[in-house]
Amino acid sequence: MNENLFASFAAPTILGLPAAVLIILFPPLLVPTSKHLINNRLITTQQWLIQLTSKQMMTMHNTKGRTWSLMLVSLIIFIATTNLLGLLPHSFTPTTQLSMNLAMAIPLWAGTVVMGFRFKTKNALAHFLPQGTPTPLIPMLIIIETISLFIQPMALAVRLTANITAGHLLMHLIGSATLALSTISLPSTLIIFTILILLTVLEIAVALIQAYVFTLLVSLYLHDNT
């Protein structure tokens, strides 16, 4: 029986029960904590990456924006870990589900907008009407800017979903082609398998880049509203 092309994106179950809870709780096990005075190389590397990410995200923010540092660092680690675990064979990638990505994007976007209207009300309202706009275009521009504001969380979620899903589908197709050619032509199989390895390396990079892009855009929205 041929496997459905989108079967890998279906929510998994264990003994008929949803495995989402186990999937969510598993990544923290990959980030060990040390009780020793001197950390080992793994924990030192993790701390260096967290400090580097925090520095990259927080340099542009003021005091109010820096209160989000823990949230943003946790977000990028969660998305990156989830994307990388999804590259394992027969695993499930939650970030291929638009519903999950919207559940991350909408609250974060709404939080930045609420902060903008609370602490910088005039500047937040000024975004709806650029300075120097001709009077006849004012109603149209207000509508356009309002629509663009509400599209931001959708763009965040769709971008992450589309990039991760496209990569997984391409890997699935090339992997299927490798298996199909294995009994027909050995040279063709080696070529396709080499392409599959290169694509896997590329997908690892995409998984990390998409986590960074998602978090960076949230950080930019926060910067605009604080």
UniProtKB/Swiss-Prot annotation:
PANTHER family: ATP SYNTHASE SUBUNIT A (PTHR11410:SF0). The keyword NADP does not apply. Its main location: mitochondrion. Pfam families: ATP-synt_A (PF00119). It catalyses: H(+)(in) = H(+)(out). InterPro entries: ATP_synth_F0_asu (IPR000568), ATP_synth_F0_asu_AS (IPR023011), ATP_synth_F0_asu_bact/mt (IPR045083), F0_ATP_A_sf (IPR035908). Component of the ATP synthase complex composed at least of ATP5F1A/subunit alpha, ATP5F1B/subunit beta, ATP5MC1/subunit c (homooctomer), MT-ATP6/subunit a, MT-ATP8/subunit 8, ATP5ME/subunit e, ATP5MF/subunit f, ATP5MG/subunit g, ATP5MK/subunit k, ATP5MJ/subunit j, ATP5F1C/subunit gamma, ATP5F1D/subunit delta, ATP5F1E/subunit epsilon, ATP5PF/subunit F6, ATP5PB/subunit b, ATP5PD/subunit d, ATP5PO/subunit OSCP. Belongs to the ATPase A chain family. GO terms for biological process: proton motive force-driven ATP synthesis; proton motive force-driven mitochondrial ATP synthesis; proton transmembrane transport. It is found in: Mitochondrion inner membrane. Disulfide bonds: none annotated. The gene is MT-ATP6. GO terms for molecular function: proton channel activity; proton-transporting ATP synthase activity, rotational mechanism. SUPFAM superfamilies: F1F0 ATP synthase subunit A (SSF81336). It is a multi-pass membrane protein. Subunit a, of the mitochondrial membrane ATP synthase complex (F(1)F(0) ATP synthase or Complex V) that produces ATP from ADP in the presence of a proton gradient across the membrane which is generated by electron transport complexes of the respiratory chain. ATP synthase complex consist of a soluble F(1) head domain - the catalytic core - and a membrane F(1) domain - the membrane proton channel. These two domains are linked by a central stalk rotating inside the F(1) region and a stationary peripheral stalk. The keyword Cell cycle does not apply. It comes from the Eukaryota. Keywords: ATP synthesis, CF(0), Hydrogen ion transport, Ion transport, Membrane, Mitochondrion, Mitochondrion inner membrane, Transmembrane, Transmembrane helix, Transport. The chain crosses the membrane at residues 6-26, 68-88, 97-117, 138-158, 164-184, 189-209. This is ATP synthase F(0) complex subunit a. PROSITE patterns: ATPASE_A (PS00449). One of its GO terms (cellular component) is proton-transporting ATP synthase complex.
